[in-house]
């Protein structure tokens, strides 16, 4: 399912092929409910024109039935932003959340309150809505996503008292807790500046002249490399490169040998 909504244009798919005991109709109802939750709710304070709404997709794959209304799943979350002067969309987030466990009964309303943890499903969906908006805003203005990352962090803090996985530091090294914690950690501030430089000063300027923008992209990669050396294997850096790997190959295919050499030194 997809449509234009308030802030997000989110395609939602629920894949329940592995589930045999539950009526498949329940998962179509769930898909519709999530679609409406993501697309019709007002997540930001800004007014979006239809063509400005943030492109994203959530693919939820049900892996196990724990009971008649409790399911274990994983969710693939992807978001993109347009590149000025082109019809190309650049990926900002590409993450598979392997701890997407939730309760759902058919036609159960998806209730959510910013100030209170009501269910793991709506907490996870709201978390990703705010992360998607925060990343988008960071790509258009320096640290422009602060407000939305703080909202995502509030959800993490509220959900950490639940017994659901992915909200706590000891649940693993690649989860919801660590992603927003990395983003708001001052030692990773350079990465957020690099995201702005990469997109707004790099990609968005390439319609006019590729020479200067590609040097800015290379400087952004240098910042990421420096951060990775001081804080190796951080989730923030890993997710940046998982989103950008194919794009970087395309960008540097037309770069000068010297620029390619610099980029390779930062990427290896």
State where each predicted segment sits.
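Acidic/His-rich structured neighborhood in mature extracellular/periplasmic domains
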Residues: 69-182
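A cross-kingdom marker for long, charged
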Residues: 13, 196, 200-268
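Start-of-domain marker
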Residues: 6-72, 83-85
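Second-shell loop/turn segments in exported
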Residues: 17-24, 111-119, 229-230
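Sec-exported extracytoplasmic/periplasmic mature domains
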Residues: 35-43, 134-138, 249, 253
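Gram-negative bacterial Sec-dependent N-terminal signal peptides
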Residues: 1-5
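Alpha-helical segments in soluble extracytoplasmic regions
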Residues: 158-224
